[in-house]
Amino acid sequence: MEHGSIITQARREDALVLTKQGLVSKSSPKKPRGRNIFKALFCCFRAQHVGQSSSSTELAAYKEEANTIAKSDLLQCLQYQFYQIPGTCLLPEVTEEDQGRICVVIDLDETLVHSSFKPINNADFIVPIEIEGTTHQVYVLKRPYVDEFLRRMGELFECVLFTASLAKYADPVTDLLDRCGVFRARLFRESCVFHQGCYVKDLSRLGRDLRKTLILDNSPASYIFHPENAVPVQSWFDDMADTELLNLIPIFEELSGAEDVYTSLGQLRAP
């Protein structure tokens, strides 16, 4: 197993550069998408009402596209219904302490820390990982203000770590990072959905009300199923002058009292 398959990271050259105004996505706010059979059927039937002027090739392509969308929506509908059955969700039931709180899914790599198999002089942690019988050292840098950020998040939300990296790396790193026990649960790569070459964090599988669920992640691909629930964050590698997490604290303080995150995020996204 290669080193790169252990840790899922953003590449420095692909990092999404966000302005302060862009900390919250500019996509339009929406209520939870009604993934129901009627919507899926509508997509199927829509292709039958294309104008007669369309060429047979265009019509065939349109039908194929509509049918693909319908199947995708129907599948996600069935998946959503399945994960509403007790015992099938990724997360345990909400504790009494977290009743009424918003659930915030928080990414690890390039959001809270940056890790490397190459030696780093000022590493905050050095974590040994065994790969195919050989022990390798992983050097971990903490993002500036991560301790303050996690402490405040733990006071306000039900916090869940969700990473596309493997548990054999992410679990010991989180043990060192989260000394105060902010994360109520930890989810790793096996809990992701592999979709079009990317590991996606499907929030509908958590077992939480999507109107009371947020995700903080540096990779838009991670929340492609639920962009309306996302608070984007700029990828971090080694800039010790970075203040992104510090700047996010007042944003999350405002969101913590939301009855519906779609409405509150929409207000934050408004120009």
UniProtKB/Swiss-Prot annotation:
Q: Name one GO biological process term.
A: negative regulation of G1/S transition of mitotic cell cycle
Q: Where is this site: Transition state stabilizer?
A: T163, K201
For the protein in the UniProt heading, the enzyme class is hydrolase
Q: Which residues form the active site?
A: D107, D109
Which gene codes for it? CTDSP2
Q: Which organism is it from?
A: Homo sapiens (Human)
Cellular compartments annotated:
Nucleus
Enzyme nomenclature, EC number: 3.1.3.16
For binding Mg(2+), which residues are annotated in this chain's numbering? D107, D109, N218
Mark the residues carrying the PTM Phosphoserine: S5
Q: What is this protein called?
A: Carboxy-terminal domain RNA polymerase II polypeptide A small phosphatase 2
Which proteins does it associate with, and in what oligomeric form? Monomer. Interacts with REST.
Q: What induces it?
A: In primary sarcomas.
Would the keyword Cell membrane turn up in this protein's UniProt record?
Answer: no
Q: Which UniProt keywords apply?
A: Hydrolase, Magnesium, Metal-binding, Nucleus, Phosphoprotein, Protein phosphatase
Q: What does this protein do?
A: Preferentially catalyzes the dephosphorylation of 'Ser-5' within the tandem 7 residue repeats in the C-terminal domain (CTD) of the largest RNA polymerase II subunit POLR2A. Negatively regulates RNA polymerase II transcription, possibly by controlling the transition from initiation/capping to processive transcript elongation. Recruited by REST to neuronal genes that contain RE-1 elements, leading to neuronal gene silencing in non-neuronal cells. May contribute to the development of sarcomas.
Q: Which tissues does it occur in?
A: Expression is restricted to non-neuronal tissues. Highest expression in pancreas and lowest in liver.
